[in-house]
């Protein structure tokens, strides 16, 4: 709740417990408003109308409710949540760093750009990554029918 949601709102992946999670920005119950970008990031994650509903009514959502409106990206049973969070971190760590960083730059700014600008950014990303050692490893792994091991 509150600051405990504002930090995850700045993250690309947000996991929640299936049971017992309490997710929301209840600051209006305290006579104040969300800080640290909570309202702006919430509106970008779930849309303006959902953000207005959640903030002005100081609603608290469960994990599954938050998943239903796109506030979290995954929901897991409490006993499995940490395992899946670690699994996600390991999965991302195994990805090609340059390609991940380049694609994030494209995606994070895409809402602020025209389609033509986003397509240009994607084309530039292809050119920036295609000759990388990771791209060579990915292609070799594909041809050899094995899992790639990126540097």
Protein language model features and the residues they cover:
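Crotonase-fold acyl-CoA enzyme core
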Residues: 1-98, 132, 136-137, 146
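Amphipathic alpha-helical segments that line or abut small-molecule/effector binding pockets
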Residues: 52-53, 120, 124
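Short, charged, surface-exposed hinge/linker loops at domain edges
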Residues: 104-113
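Short C-terminal tail/terminal secondary-structure segment
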Residues: 111, 147-151
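Short beta-strand->loop
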Residues: 113-119
